[in-house]
Amino acid sequence: MKRKTLMAITLATVTAIAPASAAFAEEATEAATEAATEAATEAATEAATEAATEAATEAAEDSTEAATEAAAEGETEAAAEVADGDVAPIEGADVAHKSSEAAPDWQAYNNLIAQIKTTTDMAEREAMMHQAEDMLMETGAIVPLYYYNDIYLQKENVTGIYCNNYGFKYFQFADAGDATTLRLNLASEPDKLDPALNSTVDGACLAVNSFDGLCTYDENGEIAMDFAESYEASEDGLSYTFTLRDGLKWSDGTDLNANDFVYSWNRAASAETGADYAYMFDPIARKDDGTLDVTASEDGKTLTINLVSPCAYFLDLCAFPAFYAVPQASVEAADGWQDNPGAWCQEAGFVSSGAYTLESWTHNESMVYVKNPNYYRADEVKIERLEFMLSADDTAIYAAYNAGDLDFADTVPTDEIQSLLDNPEFHIIDNLGTYYVAFNVNSNLFAGKTPEQASAMRRGLSLLIDRDYIVENIGQTGQQLANTFVPAGMADGNGGEFRQNDDAYTYPDADAVGYYDPSYEAYDDNLAQAIELLKEAGYEFVDDGNGNEVLSDATPIDITYITNDGSAHVAVAEAMQQDFAAIGANLTIETNEWNVFLNERKAGNFDMSRNGWLADFNDPINMLEMWTTDSGNNDVQFGR
């Protein structure tokens, strides 16, 4: 999930649920900001690009050098088949097209992800996920900088707020003593409030406090039953039956039952809705008519789901906002709902199901949520009002917090972090996700290059970035330098951690346990390697008179970098600008407010862009499936 903020968060009085390792969170309140994480994301306009209609094709020869090597080592038969171009197209897999001669052929990746989602051999599945990350990183289009953590400020009298590893913040069971109102800042104007259409972390935080699903996360970060009181899974793991609680209501007092989930899940998964997260419903089998194999009992008390293959993270999906129920009557009563599926919740007063309902919304200024008396746990909700300040100005947010006008602030100005490290109201918690920058593979930046040259160019530019400087001087809260896209701490599905060397898989840089060494000590070696890769890409270098190699005037590099206007994101861009200037490459920075930035990035109107992804659940497939051709989160335009 896309993060909106760049820094970090911890609760002193808040229960923090931390993964094995972390990274640095984005600035929570920017009018832009990502990312869930982090993130981080997207409210951008059109979601999933529909798979093109041609029959899926030859898998890419040479899909990646890493793929070939993996196959040669015999890591998995599937890996070998992908590398050799022998994988038959998978039914339902995305169909990739190359709109740029410099873009990688992406059908082999689409097919591999489809195989990962259907295999029942967990060891083979893990090997194929490593193969997929190899293919992804070989393109050079994804440039990890650090693994997320999160920072925030919270008044000492406030307790009961808790967070999970994925950036969600739960306010419904907060306690502020005699106070019944919490004044909060998460971010600027939210892009979408429809749980099915949201793809940003700040939007998810609003969703988890105003809607509910079959499952949720408790204060310990564990899956707990929510609207479902219990569930049963079949012995083969292919069927789940949930029994819903009695007396569930929408906020308008109408009944809520299993039929609402049948409607909502099919809506979220349909191409007509255009949800960025439609692909997350892929584990669910389809009926002959193409709808999800999800059935409500006649009395609406039970919901039965049949899966394509066993899915170890299925309960996590049931706790994810895209899987929440939405009120069909309200959705379809909105003017223009067929062309604008989110029209029903673009103003205050819409029907919801969680602890709070949106009472008022002054766009770009404030939102007020009030307690929902029809919430099934209403007697446990002590805070009557949540008043959100909508702003991306971290200086103004920090001033409001210090003036006593905010109880919770999800961002801190970069230049204030050092002074807050010992403040009990300042919290740093781990997230499970990666802050990264991305290249548009169809950008004119790569015009006239082969896919191999474009890859070398991107990988060379990546090695120019001083990640240590970014973390030490901008993040400042102990973020871990990133050299993989799948973050440190993510499980492998077999009881271990994915990011490690073992008998079955070794990373290209075995010592650094990743695809390169991001440390300060490796910078000189990385610079030399970057220049060699850029030469492979066709760039010429000359001596600058001081013994340094710089780009020749005959082969300049001019890149446009887009970011939202949060101060930390801009600071990261400026740091990279200086890194690129060391060899004479020019990076022009364009900043926009959050929603404009999201739309530009989703539309592919960029050379290079800031990005961030907080995991939606603890499995590498979440970091990998987002890059298939028709994924609504495929911002780099693979296969398009």
Q: Where are the regions that the model predicts?
A:
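Aromatic-rich, solvent-exposed beta-strand/loop patch
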Residues: 172, 236, 306-325, 345-396, ...
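N-terminal lobe/hinge region of extracytoplasmic solute-binding protein
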Residues: 144, 152-153, 166, 185-235, ...
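Surface-exposed binding/hinge segments that line
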Residues: 157, 278-333
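Detector for C-terminal structural segments
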Residues: 83-182, 362, 464-503, 568-577, ...
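Append "and occasionally in soluble cytosolic enzymes with long acidic Gly/Pro-rich linkers
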Residues: 105, 131, 224, 453-578
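Ligand-site clamp/hinge motif
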Residues: 267, 341-342, 347, 372-419, ...
